[in-house]
């Protein structure tokens, strides 16, 4: 029997292959695949249901319908295998050959393949250099094309209409050759000399200067070279032979009632065959040209529809008016072959059921219903029953299991022991959505889930369902246990923090037991230890919250890792002493000696993991959960209406607000404020009132007054149930309590605008009808948003996974010295993210020095773990250069040092880890939590007043970076540079706060001066931009002509007059070319020079500038010459949330991007056009100046004569990532994208490690554009894989040749996924047709490097445990020792089979 199995295994042996190539099929190739020509459109005989001969299901071509049996029934049984029946011509073999044998149709006239014709850019059109319209007119028989001009004046490829053709025939006779239809195009393609054409084009490319022409030429050269190199022939894009798909892949299925369901392909094939046969007949009869032509056109259309229905003209529809599904539709889209059957398969040995809570389970267990387990583990049970001799055959075992005999359950118990199962909850947004557990058999029909893993699954018990999968092989079980067990996934891969964290009831229970209460029963006792505390509590002698003294023994690890005991008397409460009993050895008592909220518990588990490792943490987590549940039950915390205490002040606050609103309304009616101002003010008033009410309410809820032991009143934190739930972090928030007991506040309309009448009632008082109606607005919008958000978030995740799927850690250290400089994230006065959080788990790129000395604090290539980070903090280091995947030098993949710590495991990452997918999941998974549109938080709270000063919060010294300044007449500094930053440095040299200081700010304190906390250090006018003089002297007006360039305005109230510069649009013709400016001269009337340059101090005034000086006035440096009003309220709606993240990763250009300086130099303005200004930057070194046209309405940040550096902002706006990359480099764009993405997530309180975003940025930067080819084979302007250029340049430099120069490109994630080198991966993502067309023409090889390609071809992925297998395969192939597959011929096999069968018959049945 063993030999038989061996033989059957040998039959299904797959070939070892390393790459997949796609190319055009030549007619001969198609004929070589084919097993015969399909000549008739018939499918099966309606009476006998046997396939018709030569038809679409013909058994002679495609193989027998029944296993080992010919059609007429002459040969049956295995012994005739391989015989071809002389009566019906069918080979006797297995039916499954009908899935792999192809046929063909010999087309009577060539037809163009629609993909190469219509998939843009049209390959045929590009190759022939003809417009697509013309080619189509030829193909569909509307005009002629000249193939050979001969001695006539007709050009090759010239298009002739019917009339022109007839005229030419009369004139030239047979001198020339012109045809129509696909034959003509085929002839043109055949007669092309590709190499010759390439040469001509390359010469042309070197001569031409026009940009568009060069682009077109490079496109053609690339296509021609692709044809030359891949060995494809252009004429193969025209089909002369059409392959026919094997019949079992387009089946005809009999339905009941004698009807048949058929695949649409059969209809499409039938049309082609019918038209082809008709055309053959017409050609034999030598029918008139016009009839033949029409038939040929119809054949072309039929073939088009078969290949890609609907690509040209109207789609051919079936009987039910639905377009037929063509071959192209079979593979593309969500229901296509790639995404439906290759990337997502359904698997056997799985089941699904509803989940319920299993609070008594251990962390590694799940409850599995007996019924399910019995079904899932059937084969194992059969095996065991046979092994034990309880059943003689499988059949008997089956019967036993069906009868559910008692012994079966015992066997099931054994089988299930230590056999993990996988639990999965859809949607699986990250890898923690599938984890392994050991099953525990339970009664009932619902799966029981451990409460602590709910956070990872995002599961709740309101009817969620989960699927169970059984890992069958030993390897699978091993992987499930070692890698996927829930106990091995304590930390989240997104941020390295524990994800097995108690929530809700457990938190409430722990919080309740660790709270203290004034004057509780048993206060002041002194106890010998936690055990006694528990005893007293159980006996009812002391309350859980009583403040007592307890003797506590703590254990601390010494240098050798041994535990040292330390006993002391601690002030604590009974509850905390009881909780201490479950805390593992090695943690300090201070960790539980506090009221434990959710954050504190999370920190406790994190500390436990870092100090003690995995096993104690898992046990501790379980114990915490049991304890939490127990004490939550004892606490009796519940929600009652009396817990919602409405503050007394509420009424008066609301009436005050109403009075203010009435006042504003009066002002509006008397015309003092505009409608917009009134609306804004009203909303501000209500937002403030709302805050006051909620503050009063929280103060009221937070504390209660009690009598202490000495009979005095004392404030203590309240034991109000609702407050406790919110305070502990178990459920609810201040905002929700506000709606219950304060006031509901302002509501938003569905479009995001705020309704100005707030809801003053709360839910305890109840809403009236109007208020209820307003509320429904917001509620419905919430639901609609959620639905949209989920879909959008899923799509973002899909794009991210696709772009990063092939990124795997492939080596230990690439040795690069490059890296990213990490600094703490500081916004305004607060540190949003300290340095330690940013560098923890990264590897240093260079030695970190002790600040102010040359001592090495941390050497290069050190993985910064917690202890190193403590050291950095102690020495107040505020910038560390760390390795990053963006600057990693590995060719394919990245190295472990550039990535750093594996966040989910806590050590440096292993080789073979799929970091790309992890990054994509970490960014995509919280996507559903991000709001679609940033809801105005609490209405108008997000609308802050315009900033006009900087007030520091801490004491320290000021440091100004890239600041230029002058001292004004009152001795204060005035800033005259654009992007000045002010940092506050504490006494250890750490940056505490950081602010942007605008141009024209007056500084109260200078660089390096000490300030106290709360001091204002800079002031400016937020509504105008000043023009500041850098020199002292007298003002001289130039080109300031009243009525032409300026106009005088007088203020009615003050009587002061000022000059206003007219915008060029408002000027008269005479004033158009004048450029109003203020010149500073000395007493003799000579120009004053700007210090440090040889430029005269002349300040050109932009339009709308207001001048409050008169000609000839004396001024001193730092004075304001003019003010340019800024359009305030120009804050456009910032896209927030998910769409913003998508925009960043898609690298979309913002609508009105900031304009950056392309080169460093001096600014001047050239000649203006109607709507634009000409900005000229002249480099200091005297090289070519750079010009750029800028629309006049853009506000410029620079004045004439100012010096800018490359990449400085010339005009404000959102920065375009492409500009940042071009002008400031890779690190700057990485920093930009990382910070912007983090801002969105931070706003939602989601923590994601920077490296995940960096991984995606690396993938966005994986293409480069060749600027100068050097000695390489690249084309100028060609876009190639960055790693390819790197490898090519390395080889060239090794041989002493000149490498190619290039610039890095930033692609959006969709573009980057489609531009990947693997066509299989790109085709399975989007735009399948285009990708495959392109790949086929270029004859691309897919090296199967990524994960997706390997999943599609059905082998282990080159990551994780499959990494070793692939490495091994490569190594063996390099050594040339791939084992040859044992060749079993059919003859040997049949002989051994016959032998076996005979032996089986002859022998007895009991073996």
Swiss-Prot record:
Substrates-to-products reaction catalysed: RNA(n) + a ribonucleoside 5'-triphosphate = RNA(n+1) + diphosphate
Cofactor: Mg(2+); Zn(2+)
Cofactor binding note of this UniProt entry: Binds 1 Mg(2+) ion per subunit. Binds 2 Zn(2+) ions per subunit.
GO CC, alphabetical: DNA-directed RNA polymerase complex
UniProt keyword Metal-binding, yes or no: yes
Binding site for Zn(2+) 2: 814, 888, 895, 898
Biological process per Gene Ontology, one example term: DNA-templated transcription
InterPro entries in alphabetical order: DNA-dir_RpoC_beta_prime, DNA-dir_RpoC_beta_prime_bact, RNA_pol_asu, RNA_pol_N, RNA_pol_Rpb1_1, RNA_pol_Rpb1_3, RNA_pol_Rpb1_3_sf, RNA_pol_Rpb1_4
Enzyme Commission (EC) number: 2.7.7.6
Top-level taxon of the source organism: Bacteria
Binding-site list for Zn(2+) 1: 70, 72, 85, 88
Cross-referenced SMART domains: RPOLA_N
Record-linked SUPFAM superfamilies: beta and beta-prime subunits of DNA dependent RNA-polymerase
The UniProt record lists the keyword Nucleotidyltransferase: yes
Its biological purpose: DNA-dependent RNA polymerase catalyzes the transcription of DNA into RNA using the four ribonucleoside triphosphates as substrates.
Family note: Belongs to the RNA polymerase beta' chain family.
PANTHER family recorded: DNA-DIRECTED RNA POLYMERASE, DNA-DIRECTED RNA POLYMERASE SUBUNIT BETA
Protein name: DNA-directed RNA polymerase subunit beta'
Organism classification: Bacteria, Pseudomonadati, Pseudomonadota, Gammaproteobacteria, Enterobacterales
Gene name of the record: rpoC
